[in-house]
Amino acid sequence: MKTFVAKPETVKRDWYVVDATGKTLGRLGHELARRLRGKHKAEYTPHVDTGDYIVVINAEKVAVTGNKETDKLYYWHTGYVGGIKQATFKEMIARRPEAVIEIAVKGMLPKGPLGRAMFRKLKVYAGSEHNHAAQQPQVLDI
């Protein structure tokens, strides 16, 4: 018996919608990364993108435990000398709530071209409205 290897053209990808309201950031991110990668499928193949499309709504209502709301810091650099910037979780949620989930999930995906392809299948929205109704996403309870 030969080992099954999925081919990119034969992979069936589904669309799911996830409500982030009250979900813990890390636990939600772990499950999203797992499904974007396709590890929940029997035909998972490490070097082929077998994951599904995921639409996350209500990103502004994601939760963190402990004091992370004020203690967790996000860093970025502007590209100029002395241009290091930082913001707390609370400031990031106020400024751009989608980025919080995107950063968490991106760090859990493989680095390189395959990881970037997986990340492109993640669609995050701050509110409850999304423009992927034509894909008829199924509700995924995490």
UniProtKB/Swiss-Prot annotation:
Keyword Ribosomal protein tagged: yes
Molecular function terms, GO-annotated: mRNA binding; structural constituent of ribosome
Domain of life the protein comes from: Bacteria
Keyword Ribonucleoprotein: yes
GO CC term, one of those recorded: cytosolic large ribosomal subunit
Signal peptide start-end: none
Family: Belongs to the universal ribosomal protein uL13 family.
Subunit structure: Part of the 50S ribosomal subunit.
Protein name from the UniProt record: Large ribosomal subunit protein uL13
Naturally occurring in which organism (per UniProt): Histophilus somni (Haemophilus somnus)
